């Protein structure tokens, strides 16, 4: 389990490192700091294959990819939360978290707080379970694609109006 956390931290660093950053030099230094701390270059880290890389390859569509990325980001924030008392790597994790929020949540100031709230909701609390079930219909409706019916009707009416005036 310990090596899994190390490997995940390394993978996070690699994934974020390749996507570009405003402070790439510092970001890469923090990656190196984490790699050294977790001994991530050790051959045993690769045992069992990658955790997320293979999964991400299966998600081609950009909107679909965001779904799986949200789960991966959620995992990393939980990982960072478990390591929050480690002062040796705290600065590195803070920089990576900040960059992750910037990239994944498009720099919005409200979204990170909402995201943090969501990943901290306990699923074993009965009151939370009841609330979640109560909101399930609304959530499912939000997930459904919006109907283009109104847009089509407007377009058809506009087209008919042009034809009638010609």
Swiss-Prot record:
Q: What keyword terms does UniProt attach to this protein?
A: Antiviral defense, Cytokine, Glycoprotein, Growth regulation, Pyrrolidone carboxylic acid, Secreted, Signal
Extent of the signal sequence: 1-23
Q: Which GO terms describe its cellular component?
A: extracellular space
Task: Point out residues bearing the modification Pyrrolidone carboxylic acid.
Answer: 24
Indicate yes or no for the key word NADP. Answer: no
User: Main subcellular localization, coarse class?
Assistant: secreted
Q: Which tissues and organs express this gene's product? A: Released primarily from activated T lymphocytes.
In this protein, the residues bearing a glycan are: 39, 106
Task: Give compartment(s).
Answer: Secreted
Pfam families per UniProt: IFN-gamma
Task: Enumerate the SUPFAM superfamilies for this protein.
Answer: 4-helical cytokines (SSF47266)
Which InterPro entries did the record assign?
4_helix_cytokine-like_core, Interferon_gamma
Instruction: Report quaternary structure and partners.
Output: Homodimer. Interacts with IFNGR1 (via extracellular domain); this interaction promotes IFNGR1 dimerization.
Summary of the function given for this chain in its UniProt record: Type II interferon produced by immune cells such as T-cells and NK cells that plays crucial roles in antimicrobial, antiviral, and antitumor responses by activating effector immune cells and enhancing antigen presentation. Primarily signals through the JAK-STAT pathway after interaction with its receptor IFNGR1 to affect gene regulation. Upon IFNG binding, IFNGR1 intracellular domain opens out to allow association of downstream signaling components JAK2, JAK1 and STAT1, leading to STAT1 activation, nuclear translocation and transcription of IFNG-regulated genes.
Family recorded in the similarity comment: Belongs to the type II (or gamma) interferon family.
Q: What is this protein called?
A: Interferon gamma
Organism whose genome encodes this protein: Bos indicus
Highest classification ranks of the organism? Eukaryota, Metazoa, Chordata, Craniata, Vertebrata
**Gene responsible for this protein:** IFNG
């Amino acid at each position: 389990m310990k090596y899994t956390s190390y490997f995940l931290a390394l993978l996070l660093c690699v994934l974020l490192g390749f996507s570009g950053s405003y402070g790439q030099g510092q970001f890469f230094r923090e990656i190196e700091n984490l790699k050294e701390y977790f001994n991530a270059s050790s051959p045993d880290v690769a045992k069992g294959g990658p955790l997320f890389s293979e999964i991400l390859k299966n998600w081609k569509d950009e909107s679909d990819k965001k779904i799986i990325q949200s789960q991966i980001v959620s995992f990393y924030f939980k990982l960072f939360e478990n390591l929050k008392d480690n002062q040796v790597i705290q600065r590195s994790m803070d920089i990576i978290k900040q960059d992750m929020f910037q990239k994944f949540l498009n720099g919005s100031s409200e979204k990170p707080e909402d995201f943090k709230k969501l990943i901290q909701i306990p699923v074993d609390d009965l009151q939370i379970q009841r609330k979640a079930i109560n909101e399930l219909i609304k959530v499912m409706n939000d997930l459904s694609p919006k109907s283009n019916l109104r847009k089509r009707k407007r377009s058809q009416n506009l087209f008919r109006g042009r034809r009638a005036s010609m």
